[in-house]
């Protein structure tokens, strides 16, 4: 039986080897890899495993999370006052410092021991980015950079698709559709150029949006068992996920035809198959 990445804590070794093989055997070798997957799909886990395996093969790799480029609470509160109250919640396009992310990628390309790049880190417990003096220094250009996040590679929606609310959050708290239109505009204006920098896009493909709530609830229950201060209750999690439902559904619809490599998951997060565009590879 295939391993379950959620309960075993790791993706199967065969999957990780196959993914890294697909990346490193390409000519020319890609540098910036996008790793996209819905919440709870195991993006950070897979990114870390790819970096570990690359190191064993003598390849210098680095994982970045788009979460580390969130605006802090103060900046988002300004957005909430000036644009829409729902922007107080981090996560949707428009709540990341995309300029900082571009700058970090540029710095990594030029990193040396004398002029190291510095990788930001966001403290979710404090809801702010840690001080630059504590950012991770990188003293040489990585051979492979993996950028992971829930919205990586997701294209904006057509204007007509924004008219109808997808859940009660949009129905009651975004009655005039101004929040979702603003988020969509950010995706088109500021995130699309970032996606264009990707040399390859990998998708952790969930079977349906309906599994996201259970996957994330499993993670939150694990946090509650450890008495983590930021663990969400089931009801709080349900509301939280509504912020991302629209673009999560857009990802499931749009990314399968855009991804260079899909890791197809079942409802238990087990890997069913790996597929390149129109071609199975595992």
Which residues does each PLM region occupy?
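Post-Walker A helix-loop "phosphate-sensing" segment adjacent to the P-loop in P-loop NTPases
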Residues: 52-62
């Amino acid at each position: 039986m295939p391993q379950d990445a959620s309960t075993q804590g790791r993706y199967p070794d065969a999957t990780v080897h196959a993914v890294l093989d697909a990346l490193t055997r390409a000519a020319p070798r890609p540098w910036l890899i996008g790793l996209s997957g819905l919440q709870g799909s195991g993006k950070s886990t897979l990114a870390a495993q790819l970096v570990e395996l690359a190191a064993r093969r003598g390849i210098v790799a680095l994982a970045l999370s788009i979460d580390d480029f969130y605006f802090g609470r103060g900046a988002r509160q300004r957005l909430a006052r000036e644009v829409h109250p729902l922007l107080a919640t981090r996560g949707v396009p428009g709540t990341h410092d995309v300029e900082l992310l571009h700058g970090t990628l540029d710095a990594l390309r030029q990193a040396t021991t004398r002029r190291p790049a510095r990788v930001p880190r966001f403290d979710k417990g404090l809801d702010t980015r840690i001080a630059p003096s504590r950012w991770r220094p990188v003293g040489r250009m990585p051979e492979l950079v993996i950028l992971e996040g829930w919205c990586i590679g997701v294209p904006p929606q057509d204007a007509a698709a924004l008219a109808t609310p997808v859940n009660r959050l949009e129905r009651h708290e975004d009655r005039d559709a101004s929040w979702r239109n603003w988020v969509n505009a950010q995706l088109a204006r500021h995130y699309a150029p970032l996606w264009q920098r990707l040399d390859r896009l990998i998708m952790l493909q969930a079977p349906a949006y309906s599994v996201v709530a259970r996957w994330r609830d499993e993670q939150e229950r694990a946090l509650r068992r450890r008495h983590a201060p930021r663990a969400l209750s089931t009801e709080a999690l349900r509301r939280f996920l509504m912020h991302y439902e629209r673009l999560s559904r857009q990802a499931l619809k749009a990314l399968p035809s855009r991804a260079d490599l899909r890791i197809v998951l079942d409802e238990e997060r087990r890997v069913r198959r790996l597929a390149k565009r129109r071609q199975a590879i595992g």
